[in-house]
UniProtKB/Swiss-Prot annotation:
Pfam families: Ribosomal_L4 (PF00573). The gene is rplD. Keywords: Ribonucleoprotein, Ribosomal protein, RNA-binding, rRNA-binding. One of the primary rRNA binding proteins, this protein initially binds near the 5'-end of the 23S rRNA. It is important during the early stages of 50S assembly. It makes multiple contacts with different domains of the 23S rRNA in the assembled 50S subunit and ribosome. Forms part of the polypeptide exit tunnel. SUPFAM superfamilies: Ribosomal protein L4. The keyword Ribosomal protein applies. This is Large ribosomal subunit protein uL4. PANTHER family: 50S RIBOSOMAL PROTEIN L4, LARGE RIBOSOMAL SUBUNIT PROTEIN UL4M. It comes from the Bacteria. Residues 43-65 are annotated as: Disordered. Gene3D superfamilies: 3.40.1370.10. The keyword Ribosomal protein applies. InterPro entries: Ribosomal_uL4 (IPR002136), Ribosomal_uL4-like (IPR013005), Ribosomal_uL4_dom_sf (IPR023574). Belongs to the universal ribosomal protein uL4 family.
Length: 200
């Protein structure tokens, strides 16, 4: 199949990478797993056995008229432990390489079908200036966009850093979440070829 390249000849690409049927269940599974893997999972609370103090019985068992109590760190008490205390946990989910690649292919194919993937011969700016990047994106009528280049472009990354709904990455930095998060994906011809090789 062929991808249209702005201001250049069409690019021949693999049908299996850019023309595959959309697998919603797979994409959902991989996106959820990717987001889950980004969770810190460091929350921690203390149970009654972990809270400092509470070793001595506050008052004797019988004869005071008060409710019986064995520790001042009971979950019922103020400053007591937490009944079902949250503990650090690993939220990451297992995703096979085949599934991950399949999801990326599915997303890229859907972007092509929805005319959300724009391919250009080259995309760079002379200086790390946000103003320059804004002007260049305005020419292409883009504002909510992920820019993917074949190699690391320091100027582009620095200029995009301060823009809302604009991100610049090299091919190694793309992931399922970033591909679905933006309205458009702008790729250089070199990046398209690299993605194709990566997912072959």
């Amino acid at each position: 199949m062929e991808l249209m390249v702005k201001g250049a000849a069409a690019l021949t690409v693999s049908e299996t990478t850019f023309g595959r049927e959309f697998n919603e269940a797979l994409v959902h599974q991989v996106v959820v797993a990717y987001a889950a893997g980004a969770r810190q999972g460091t929350r921690a609370q203390k149970t009654r056995s972990e809270v400092s103090g509470g070793g001595a019985k506050p008052w004797r068992q019988k004869g005071t008229g008060r409710a019986r109590a064995g520790t001042i760190r009971s979950p019922i008490w103020r400053s007591g432990g937490v009944t079902f205390a949250a503990k650090p946990q690993d939220h990451s989910l297992k995703v096979n390489k085949k599934m991950y690649r399949g999801a990326l292919k599915s997303i890229l194919s859907e972007l092509v079908r929805q005319d959300r993937l724009i391919v250009v011969e080259d995309f760079s700016i002379e200086a790390p200036k946000t103003k320059e990047l804004v002007a260049k994106l305005k020419e292409l009528e883009l504002n909510d966009v992920l820019i993917v280049t074949g190699e690391v472009d320091e100027n582009l990354f620095l200029a995009a850093r301060n823009l809302y709904k604009v991100d610049a990455r090299d091919v190694a930095g793309i992931d399922p979440v970033s591909l679905v998060a933006f309205n458009k994906v702008l790729m250089t011809a070199a990046a398209v070829k690299q993605v194709e090789e990566m997912l072959a």
